[in-house]
Regions:
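Intrinsically disordered, low-complexity repeat and linker tracts
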Residues: 1-3, 278-280
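Acidic Gly/Asp/Thr-rich repetitive segments characteristic of extracellular carbohydrate-active
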Residues: 2-20, 36-47
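Structural signature of tandem-repeat unit edges
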Residues: 25-31, 61-74, 88-106, 115-127, ...
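Extracellular beta-strand-rich solenoid/capping regions of secreted or surface-exposed proteins
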Residues: 37-51, 77-85
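A structural signal for leucine-rich repeat
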Residues: 81-82, 199-200, 221-231, 252-255
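Surface-exposed intrinsically disordered loops and tails
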Residues: 88, 252-273
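Consensus positions within tandem repeat domains that build extended binding/scaffold surfaces
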Residues: 108-111, 130-132, 151-154, 173-176, ...
Length: 286
């Protein structure tokens, strides 16, 4: 891991960028703090056209930097947030084309909010806090084989994302995929606790794989505030659930769907291709 000071780290990254390098690899200490990440983002921000405003960067700018960070266990909140009122080095997020976090286990809230990257890989991340990748409108490739917990709206407004695999994910906050209008397939075979408006405005969905669902937040009693919302035609969606799935019932006092003791397999809901108030193209148990 680097023994550099923040100034030395900033200078090293700046030199690499000035030499025309676009593949930037940095090895940080496990406990690297926000000041070390700021040294990196301050250098990256200088590669972005200063005449472009925030709107132009978010909507139209294509990043050119492939960034790999190893060693560090946590990416601090708002590190690459593209917002001039939140992040001093806000242009750095627009510089990114791809991000690889080889050793990180936690990604802080809004860490990559509205960044320009198309590819994101974090093989050892266990938890991603709320809004961390929200608004990454060019993001198409995501590799998160170990993540177990996703906070609210982690992938909200990732308009280009078509498919995602979350093989170890158990807990999803509210609106994780809200407005992912190109999203076609979601594979989360261990997901048991789901938030409200999880798939709101995911109008391209064709297949969703979940685990043995135990709870689903619906916020209000209206199905409009449920997992899929009425904006989606769930009759075009193939739903896959665990063979251990139980029938769900709605608790109006808590605004949650909760699993009962009754097997879903062979139930009226199953026979009617229904789950938590929605009717699907098919409901398969595996």
């Amino acid at each position: 891991a680097t023994a550099m000071s923040t100034d030395e780290l900033n200078a090293a990254v700046t030199r690499a960028l000035a030499a025309g390098e676009t593949d930037i690899r940095i090895n940080l200490a496990e406990d690297a703090d926000a000041t070390m990440f700021s040294a990196i983002t301050a250098a990256l921000a200088t590669t972005v056209d200063p005449s472009l405003d925030q709107y132009e960067l978010v909507m139209n700018y294509s990043g050119t930097i492939d960034l790999t960070i190893s060693g560090a266990k946590t990416v601090p909140e708002c590190t690459f947030y593209v917002d001039e009122y939140v992040n001093e080095n806000w242009r750095a997020g627009a510089a990114l084309r791809s991000v690889t976090l080889t050793d990180a286990t936690t990604i802080g809230e809004s860490a990559f909010f509205s960044s320009a990257m198309t590819s994101f890989s974090a093989p050892n991340v266990i938890e991603i806090e709320g809004f961390a990748l929200e608004g990454c409108m060019k993001l198409t490739d995501v590799y998160l084989p170990s993540v177990q917990t996703l906070g609210d709206a982690v992938f909200s407004d990732c308009y280009a994302l078509k498919t995602i695999s979350l093989p170890e994910c158990i807990d999803l906050g509210n609106g994780v995929f809200n407005s992912c209008e190109a999203l076609e397939t979601v594979y989360a075979p261990k997901a048991t606790n789901l938030g409200a408006i999880e798939f709101m405005l995911c109008t391209s969905l064709t297949k969703v794989t979940l685990g043995s669902v135990q709870s689903v937040n619906q916020i209000y009693e209206s199905i409009d505030d449920g997992l899929f919302c009425l904006a989606n035609d769930t009759k075009n969606i193939e739903l896959v659930l665990s063979s251990e799935q139980k029938v769900m019932t709605f608790d109006s006092s808590t605004k949650y769907w909760k699993a009962t003791d009754t097997d879903y397999n062979g139930s009226d809901d199953h026979n009617n291709k229904s789950f938590i108030g929605y009717t699907f193209k098919s409901v398969t148990l595996q």
